[in-house]
């Protein structure tokens, strides 16, 4: 995204000229050996304005918005630099797949998706580049901190035990957030200054100033340009210091300043969601016969044999006997191919898709998966209340997300502390 321009040119004038003294672009900031130009800043400011209008938020002062957007671009550039250093790339096919999923989740086809993007004043190429950037940043964050995120069974059980003592622990909480940042190792003066700044913002909010506008203008949080909107979160997803507050807050109330690792926070409770409903799943009792190429059977022979077995079963041969005689899945073959009761998501997608489409007691045509060729028969289906297991899995995911967010914030803080950042345009400093 960012253009590389000779540092000497940027340092002395902030403006670079081509051979004919033609103006190229103005440098507004230097981030290590990268630069951010005024055209890049202007484009992102315009995009942010459109988002603010679309979300019906108060528009902040132009100069304040430009400063905030520049800080966002600096953070993005630092992470993009880390992605490059680590050799992380995103293939076009991966972008295509991501866009298809986004379109499907919005009940649009690709043509409709293009139209919607164009209506927002964004070219399709720009949109693809933004998706690429988001995927790169997500991947570099995972590489930087993901391997260290571990949630044990004991932590899940302890959370559930503690949550049982907290009223409304099963609810979801829609929050907005303002972050006044701190360095990795703040001095006493820096702590006092940040806390006073947070208290001053809290007083402004109490006097009627708009929380979202102040978040855009003052917050250093990841969602500052979205008005500090964190969206709807389960209690387990929130930092513990937030969770302790929100269960006692009323909708519309603002709490803080709250001290966390990356700074002082103000949080606003926008809405409270309903309790999680019962989670019921469809279990399937299924059996299969597996044929796969090996040293004694080339692929063409495997296909020929599985089709032959299919024809024999269609002619009345017993599925279980054929499984015992021919299936190469040793564990299930001795049981007549019986896999027992399986839950959604336990089997490979190609197998599960065919299984779910089968009527009871009808044998599928040969199905190819990574393991070989399968013949599948559904023996029975039943509904099961999976609420307890589902709740534990949700809590595990929420705790992982909480740890991940906190680790990413600390990593971003460290990136900034180690970087050379020079805001050349002093109006933006």
From Swiss-Prot:
Enzyme Commission code(s) on record: 5.2.1.8
A biological process term (GO) from this entry: protein folding
Domain (PpiC) ranges: 170-271, 281-380
Domain of life from the UniProt record: Bacteria
Signal peptide: 1-18
Cellular component terms (Gene Ontology): outer membrane-bounded periplasmic space
GO molecular function: peptide binding; peptidyl-prolyl cis-trans isomerase activity; unfolded protein binding
InterPro entries to which the protein is assigned, alphabetical: OMP_Chaperone_SurA (IPR050280), PPIase_dom_sf (IPR046357), PPIase_PpiC (IPR000297), PPIase_SurA (IPR023034), SurA_N (IPR015391), Trigger_fact/SurA_dom_sf (IPR027304)
Keywords, in A-Z order: Chaperone, Isomerase, Periplasm, Repeat, Rotamase, Signal
Compartments where found: Periplasm
Predominant place of localization: periplasm
Annotated catalysed reactions: [protein]-peptidylproline (omega=180) = [protein]-peptidylproline (omega=0)
Role description: Chaperone involved in the correct folding and assembly of outer membrane proteins. Recognizes specific patterns of aromatic residues and the orientation of their side chains, which are found more frequently in integral outer membrane proteins. May act in both early periplasmic and late outer membrane-associated steps of protein maturation.
PANTHER family, per database record: CHAPERONE SURA
Domain notes: The PPIase activity resides only in the second parvulin domain. The N-terminal region and the C-terminal tail are necessary and sufficient for the chaperone activity of SurA. The PPIase activity is dispensable for SurA to function as a chaperone. The N-terminal region and the C-terminal tail are also required for porin recognition.
Name listed for the protein in its UniProt record: Chaperone SurA
Organism: Legionella pneumophila (strain Paris)
Encoding gene, per UniProt annotation: surA
């Amino acid at each position: 995204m960012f253009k590389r321009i000779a540092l000497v040119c940027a340092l002395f004038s902030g403006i670079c000229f081509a051979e004919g003294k033609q103006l190229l672009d103005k440098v507004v900031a230097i981030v290590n050996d990268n630069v951010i130009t005024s055209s890049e800043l202007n484009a992102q400011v315009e995009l942010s304005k459109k988002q603010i209008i679309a979300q019906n938020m108060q528009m902040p002062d132009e100069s304040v918005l430009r400063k905030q957007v520049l800080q966002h671009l600096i953070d993005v550039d630092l992470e993009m630099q880390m992605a490059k250093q680590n050799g992380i790339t995103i293939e076009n096919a991966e972008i295509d797949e991501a866009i298809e999923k986004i379109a499907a989740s919005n009940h649009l086809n690709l043509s409709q998706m293009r139209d919607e993007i164009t209506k927002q004043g964004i070219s399709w190429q720009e949109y693809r580049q933004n998706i690429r950037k988001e995927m790169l940043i997500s991947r570099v964050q995972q590489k930087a901190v993901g391997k260290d995120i571990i949630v044990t069974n004991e932590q899940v059980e302890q959370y559930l035990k503690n949550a049982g003592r907290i009223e409304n622990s099963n609810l979801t909480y829609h929050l907005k957030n303002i972050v006044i940042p701190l360095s990795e190792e703040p001095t006493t003066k820096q702590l006092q200054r940040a806390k006073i700044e947070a208290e001053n913002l809290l007083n402004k909010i109490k006097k009627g100033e708009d929380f979202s506008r102040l978040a855009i203008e003052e917050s250093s949080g990841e969602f500052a340009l979205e008005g500090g909107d964190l969206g709807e979160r389960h209690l387990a997803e929130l930092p513990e210091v937030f969770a302790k507050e929100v269960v006692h807050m009323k909708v519309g109330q603002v709490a803080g300043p709250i001290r966390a690792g990356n700074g002082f926070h103000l949080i606003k409770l926008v809405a409270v969601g309903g309790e999680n409903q019962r989670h019921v799943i469809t279990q399937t009792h299924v059996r299969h016969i597996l044929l796969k190429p090996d040293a004694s059977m080339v692929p063409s022979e495997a296909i020929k044999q599985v089709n032959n077995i299919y024809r024999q079963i269609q002619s009345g041969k017993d599925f279980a006997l054929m499984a015992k005689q021919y299936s190469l899945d040793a564990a299930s073959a001795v049981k007549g191919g019986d896999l027992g009761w399986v839950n959604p998501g336990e089997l490979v997608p190609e197998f599960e898709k065919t299984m779910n489409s089968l009527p009871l007691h009808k044998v599928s045509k040969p199905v190819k998966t990574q393991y070989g060729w399968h013949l599948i028969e559904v023996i029975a289906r039943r509904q099961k209340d999976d609420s307890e297991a589902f709740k534990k899995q949700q809590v595990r995911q929420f705790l992982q997300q909480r740890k991940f967010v906190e680790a990413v914030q600390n990593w971003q803080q460290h990136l900034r502390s180690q970087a050379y950042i020079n805001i050349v345009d002093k109006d933006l400093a």
